[in-house]
Amino acid sequence: MTHVDTAGSGTATRWGRAAVVLITMSVFGPYLAGGIRTEQVAVYGAAVLLCALGLWSRVSLTTAGGVVVALHLAVVGVATIGVVFPPLNPTLHSVGSLTGGYDSLLLPLAVVLVLAMLVGSGANPAALLRSVCIVTVWAMAANTVVAIYSISSNSTTVLALFRLFGEGESVADRAERMGRYSGIFNQPAEAGLLYSVALLAAIYLYRDHIPKFTVSVAALTIGGTLSVSKIFLLVGAPIALAQILLVPGRRRRMWSLALTAVSVGLLTQLDVLERWDGRDFLLRLLPGAGQGDQVTLYTAGRFGEHSSLNEVVGAAFDISPMTGAGVRGLQLPYDNGWVEALVIAGVIGVVLHTALLAALFVGWLHGRSARPESVLAGGLVLAVVGASFGLPAITANRCATIVWLLLGLLLVVARPAAATTWWQRPGEGRHRVPPAVAPRLVGAGRRP
């Protein structure tokens, strides 16, 4: 991407970096008064402020980004039908919160809007992307420290400020009784997705810096393992391992893997980790170690015999199969992106959700190049699609904001007056470069 080296451009980049750093850090903040999350204040506040400054007129999206935003808006529209014309609810399940439902759907749009206004005003998207990645990597590394500390101490009172506003037992509290420690996150699945995203970001940032690579990847691997999240173990970690193995340079690749393995091994010898009671739960996931249906085991009962999703799917079809129960949803755990779409927007929502994920993949496929950003984007899309089988990855609290910050900068937001991603080199045909899984693509160090 070509930037005019002017004071205005530099100023826009500095303010843009400050904005995305603030938003990224807010994801790891506590609940505030009235059950409001820190990230809600940061994202909506930034969107309102930038719109008030008139930057809304500078918004520019890629072709794929325009399709993604249109599909997401269509989901919002279909889900709103259930608000304007509430369907009969013959089930025994109560509807959810109207504000909570709209927040889940509108927050991703607000994140994309903020990014588009920042880039449209002259901020360098490469600098913004790097800032988001740095904060995400080291914040999740810090979350690993919190998770380790939780093993040997009773930190429930403090962590409740981050996990669940108000009284009651959180999902994380119940998970910890099984030895699954997710730090500040309310669900191991949320932690697993963000550890996966942070791992991909660490590879992108430190692929040529072995010390930082080793420390960050080791910390993130331990944190993801302590959460015993299938999203991390079965989706994020394999994708990250594949990218590490494809780093060019045999010696550098072997050093990176060896140092990371040694670091993980040494850290697991800490006295506190030796007392980790989730080891048995983790070992059950090894092939042949678990009893009963392996599909049920690997998906935590979401799929396989006696699927936990059957009740939710049945309730959605009983209420309104085509348009769903509306944006309020039902007070049931969805545990799946497509199931959430079915509940709030019916079969139409499922089709739109699938099309949105496909649009992200096609957007990456058409814009892939020999740049490391292409590898990050491809891994991120695969992680989001895989994670969607275990939670609503593009709308879930906290992790959705990080996901859309990265997806927005990589695939959705365009250069001013352009319809392509900023990291796609002009003049290079999309079919002249093989898919971004070839070894030489991962290590391409050219910067915009």
Residue ranges of predicted features:
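Interfacial loop-to-transmembrane-helix boundary motif in multi-pass membrane proteins
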Residues: W15-A19, V67-V75, L115-F162
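Long extracytoplasmic/lumenal interhelical loops at the membrane interface
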Residues: F281-L283, A289-I348, W364-S369
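A membrane-periplasm/extracellular boundary helix in multi-pass inner-membrane enzymes
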Residues: S152-N154, V247-D293, A315
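Alpha-helical transmembrane segments of multi-pass inner-membrane proteins
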Residues: R130-L161, D173-R177, S182-V228, L233-L245
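N-terminal hydrophobic segments of proteins, predominantly signal-anchor/transmembrane helices
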Residues: W15-Y31, A47-A116, L382-S388
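Transmembrane alpha-helices of multi-pass inner-membrane enzymes
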Residues: G379-A387, A393-G443, P448
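Loop-to-helix entry and N-terminal half of a specific, functionally important transmembrane alpha helix
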Residues: A18-S26, W364-L391, I402, L409-L411
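Hydrophobic transmembrane alpha-helices and their immediate junctions
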Residues: H209-I210, A237, L241-I244, R250, ...
